[in-house]
């Protein structure tokens, strides 16, 4: 079993290697970004189709995309920080795909709009998104370490 360092950046395992992106990496970032944006659109569409009334009352699609992105970023973050992952994979998956799939700006907007409609609803969404994102990231981290 992998033992995580005690401090946030204590130990070599959690110190990110510098990303040496160059112009050659832009294509990988663009390609990952296009797929991440398409995945985001698919998640939003699925949320709307599965529960149209609930979708109008609560931003389920953003919540689902951010939770999935938190899970996946923990997997790729663990691979990047604890094992070697090439610069192209890092550019494609982390900067491109996950950067397009998850959006903090949408989270902030939905939280504020929910708060304006109902402080309880806005608080539940804002707090729930944060908690779900952290739990998803923890699950991704633990799963990846278990598999490594």
Curated annotation (Swiss-Prot):
Protein task: Fluoride-specific ion channel. Important for reducing fluoride concentration in the cell, thus reducing its toxicity.
Protein name per Swiss-Prot or TrEMBL: Fluoride-specific ion channel FluC 2
Pfam families registered for this protein in UniProt: CRCB
Membrane topology: Multi-pass membrane protein
HAMAP family per UniProt: FluC
Main localization (coarse): membrane
Summary of activators and inhibitors of this protein: Na(+) is not transported, but it plays an essential structural role and its presence is essential for fluoride channel function.
């Amino acid at each position: 079993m992998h033992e995580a360092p005690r401090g946030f950046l204590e130990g070599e395992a959690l110190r990110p290697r510098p990303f040496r992106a160059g112009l050659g990496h832009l294509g990988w970032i663009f390609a990952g970004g296009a797929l991440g944006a398409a995945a985001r659109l698919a998640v939003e569409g699925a949320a709307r189709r599965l529960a149209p009334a609930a979708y109008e009352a609560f931003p389920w699609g953003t919540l689902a995309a951010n939770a999935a992105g938190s899970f996946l970023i923990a997997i790729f973050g663990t691979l990047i920080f604890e094992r070697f992952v090439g610069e192209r994979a890092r550019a494609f998956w982390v900067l491109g795909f996950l950067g397009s799939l998850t959006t903090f700006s949408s989270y902030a907007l939905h939280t504020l709009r929910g708060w304006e409609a109902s402080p309880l609803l806005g608080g539940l969404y804002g707090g729930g998104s944060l908690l779900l994102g952290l739990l998803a990231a923890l699950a991704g981290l633990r799963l990846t370490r278990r598999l490594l």
